[in-house]
Amino acid sequence: MPKLCILSNSHGFIHPEVVKIANQCDIAIHAGDIINESTLSQLKPKQKLIAIQGNNDDHISSLNKIEFLEFPSGKIAIEHGHLHGHQKPSHESLRSAYPDAKVIIYGHTHKQVIDKESTPWVINPGASGEIRNHGGSKCFTMGIYDDKEWLITPYVFIS
């Protein structure tokens, strides 16, 4: 069972508790707006770090705008989300872009969202840093147990 830490919108700072969770997971996923690439060096998951460009990361040319992660029980699509609606990315637009995914991860809004109303699920971990974190730095963990159970757990840390 792989365990993932999902974060976004760090804007140069990741809350220490989010770093701690990421480093205890097998895979860490950062859904963009990193701002300072050295921020990623704090993240040392057991197996793999995946990070994508956000709308403020054009200067980090080593990162892709979209990434995919595949498991026997489904695929995860990762993008920042800003191209699907600037103020509030459209979940229907994201679902149309990645119809074969089980989960779509996006960032951009700084707001934590778990939308399981239809497949693929659309999730946003919220802001992991201090800027516009709407009541605390946030992240998700996701445990992939088998074909039927993918468990998402939200975290909020008040500084």
Which positions does each model-derived feature cover?
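Conserved beta-sheet core of the metallophosphoesterase superfamily
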Residues: 50, 87-155
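Helix-adjacent hinge/juxtasegments
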Residues: 50-92, 96-100
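Short active-site segment of divalent metal-dependent hydrolases/proteases
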Residues: 12, 36, 83, 111, ...
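N-terminal active-site segment of His-dependent metallophosphoesterases
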Residues: 1-47, 57-66, 71-73, 138-141, ...
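Conserved histidine-centered catalytic loops in small-molecule metabolism enzymes
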Residues: 157-159
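Glutamate identity and glutamate-enriched acidic tracts
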Residues: 37, 67-70, 79, 117, ...
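Active-site neighborhood of phospho(di)ester-bond hydrolases with catalytic His/Asp-centered motifs
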Residues: 6-8, 28-33, 50-55, 78-80, ...
